[in-house]
Amino acid sequence: MIDLVNANLLNSLARRLVREGLLDEYQALTAQKDAQQQKLPFIHYLSSTGRINSDLLAYLVAEEFGLPYLDLDTFDTRYLPKKAVDEQLLRKHQALPLYKRGNVLSLALSTPTNLAAIDEIQFQTGLTIHPIIVAEEKLHQMLETSLETDIAALGDLESIELEALQL
């Protein structure tokens, strides 16, 4: 059980992790303090330590913030909206557009408090952003794979154009 002094020091996610038995109070307080000292979002810090399964963490984050959760293992990358968002913004904010419907862009994020990502991407695209919470390590893998595929496709296109010019 969380004592009243420490309960006031823990953020809502940390309290939830203690209630779920995934961390004790001391671990939660220490993790919060370490994340602040390293200037990392609490969720990123927890993911990087490996103390909590990243899928479970993402699910609890989504529940705690009232946002949808998606297991990226179940997502078909063929349907990713290509070129919906500038590659530099995606890398900067570790965000991945999942699908676009009308003027709404569903965006995979591991940290729902990353308001800068939502604001910048919304400004750049002119679309309403619908955040979807995903596991951080899976997001990173899918983002890199997706961007590498785009770069490889551009390389193929350039070689085809050069061959056509040589003919």
Q: Predicted regions span which residues?
A:
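N-terminal, intrinsically disordered, highly charged
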Residues: M1-L167
